[in-house]
UniProtKB/Swiss-Prot annotation:
It comes from the Bacteria. Its main location: cytoplasm. It is found in: Cytoplasm. Belongs to the cytidylate kinase family. Type 1 subfamily. CDD domains: CMPK. It catalyses: CMP + ATP = CDP + ADP; dCMP + ATP = dCDP + ADP. Keywords: ATP-binding, Cytoplasm, Kinase, Nucleotide-binding, Transferase. This is Cytidylate kinase.
Length: 217
């Protein structure tokens, strides 16, 4: 039995999975399903960025005032829960994520959580490269922008939120550009990550593919 397979199946062992990918690539659904399969705590790192964005909007903080944003990033409570799926919040989160000091402050919360949680799957954009470079297993999920926009459109419609497909597509393209081109922790797969394009795959088929890789002898 491989060491990876042993850690995955023995729930008494520490096991850390880093799952990265762009917006609406399907990593959330896939991550949740994988976490259930291997008895892992499932954490979306984006929650701290979206929560900071929510706080900036709520407190009417101009996100170009970097010092105020940095100061606010020190006070994030990772246990707070809000409905943060709004695309405007996601856009603000992507903008403040380029600030090095903000990423440092928020990543400290995430690293602490990983270090104090024996079995965890953390999903985000730089988990395998920055937050948890020593994770036991790294996955990078992607899909073409049109497919991702359609997925997000359906998600928002299901929640009864008004949305326009083309606007969502343009927001995703803009966020991709910002995430990939930022100087601090740009969006890219770790060198040792398993890369999967989900454009034509169901979440279940992706999970099965990942499980086959983890559980192979």
């Amino acid at each position: 039995m491989t060491n990876l397979k042993s850690k995955a199946l023995d729930f008494t062992q520490n096991f850390v999975i880093a799952l990265d990918g762009p917006a609406a690539s399907g990593k959330g659904t896939i991550g949740f399903m994988l976490a259930e399969k291997f008895s892992l705590k499932y954490v979306q790192s984006s929650i701290v960025y979206r929560q900071l964005a929510f706080n900036c909007i709520k407190e009417k903080i101009d996100i170009t005032d970097i010092n105020k944003v940095i100061s606010l990033s020190k006070e994030i409570n990772i246990t707070d829960k809000f409905d943060l799926e709004d695309e405007n919040i996601g856009g603000v989160a992507s903008q403040i994520a380029v600030i090095a000091e903000v990423r440092d402050n928020l990543n400290k919360h995430l690293v602490k959580l990983i270090n104090t949680t024996p079995r965890i799957l953390m999903e985000g954009r730089d988990i395998g490269t920055i937050v948890a470079p020593n994770a036991d297993f790294k996955i990078f999920i992607t899909a073409n922008p049109e497919v991702r926009a359609e997925r997000r459109y359906k998600q928002l419609q299901a929640k009864g939120k008004a949305c326009i497909l083309d606007e969502i597509l343009q927001q995703i393209i803009l966020r991709d550009k910002r995430d990939k081109e930022r100087e601090v922790a740009p969006l890219l797969p770790a060198l040792d990550a398993l890369i999967i394009d989900t454009s034509k795959l169901s979440p279940l088929s992706v999970v099965e593919q990942i499980m086959q890789f983890i559980l192979k002898e």
